[in-house]
């Protein structure tokens, strides 16, 4: 079971056993759950999914991309916020949604977003590895691992794997996040708009 804090065990029938005293509410288990049944108060697959669906998607005739950013609320989202406060500009075609931890990102959100006409999805989270900065220890690492396998799903949908990107961001990277976004938007423009536009 994917929990960086060991809050989920299995019984003899391999059903999950939750130890709420160890749970830090990072949502990493929610991101790993294929049937989207794990949720927390004020944070669930449905609440984030609703935010993703609420974004206006330009139609195929407008020739404007729409890019979703799922940003860790601990480092990446504050860096985006600080970029705005410092008037550092980046593409107007992105829409950022904060997530509790990058580890909480469920691949269903990615495929739902791309199926509904988003041209790309960028995930921004804390640094992983030996000198990790993830507030939930392995959340970012687990998200990177999960996203490394999404290419096959995208190919089945007839989409390029480059439409999904994961970036490590520090809370002080306010100028860098703007640059990463603009580079990604340029990459999406080069690939072309999503063939899913108009079908969502």
How should these model regions be labeled?
Residues 97-175:
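Cofactor-cradling patches in redox/metallo enzymes
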Residues 77-81:
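Short N-terminal binding/cap micro-motifs at the start of the first secondary-structure element
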Residues 1-18, 24, 28-51:
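Iron-sulfur cluster-binding cysteine motifs and their immediate structural context
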Residues 43-75:
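A short, flexible N-terminal coil/short beta segment enriched in small residues
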Residues 3, 23-29, 33, 72, ...:
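Disulfide-bonded cysteines in secreted/extracellular proteins and peptides
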Residues 84-96:
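Short helix-loop-beta junction
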Residues 27-40, 56-62, 66, 155-159:
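Short Fe-S-cluster ligation motifs
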Residues 159-199:
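Peripheral docking tails and interdomain loops at the edges
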């Amino acid at each position: 079971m994917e929990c960086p804090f060991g809050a989920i065990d299995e019984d003899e029938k391999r059903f999950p056993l939750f130890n709420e005293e160890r749970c830090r509410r990072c949502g990493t288990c929610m991101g790993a759950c294929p049937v989207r049944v794990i949720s927390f108060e004020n944070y669930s697959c449905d609440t984030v999914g609703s935010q993703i669906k609420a974004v206006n998607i330009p139609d195929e005739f407008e020739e404007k991309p729409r890019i979703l950013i799922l940003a860790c609320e601990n480092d990446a989202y504050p860096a985006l916020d600080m970029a705005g406060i410092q008037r550092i500009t980046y593409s107007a075609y992105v829409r950022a949604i904060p997530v509790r931890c990058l580890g909480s990102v469920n691949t269903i959100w990615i495929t739902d977003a791309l199926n509904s006409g988003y041209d790309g999805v960028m995930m921004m989270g804390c640094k992983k590895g030996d000198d990790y900065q993830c507030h939930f220890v392995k959340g970012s690492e687990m998200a990177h691992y999960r996203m490394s396998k999404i290419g096959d799903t995208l190919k089945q949908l007839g989409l390029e794997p480059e439409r999904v990107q994961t970036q490590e961001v520090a809370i002080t990277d306010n100028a860098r996040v703007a640059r990463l976004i603009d580079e990604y938007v340029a990459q999406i423009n080069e690939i072309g708009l999503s063939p899913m536009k108009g079908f969502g």
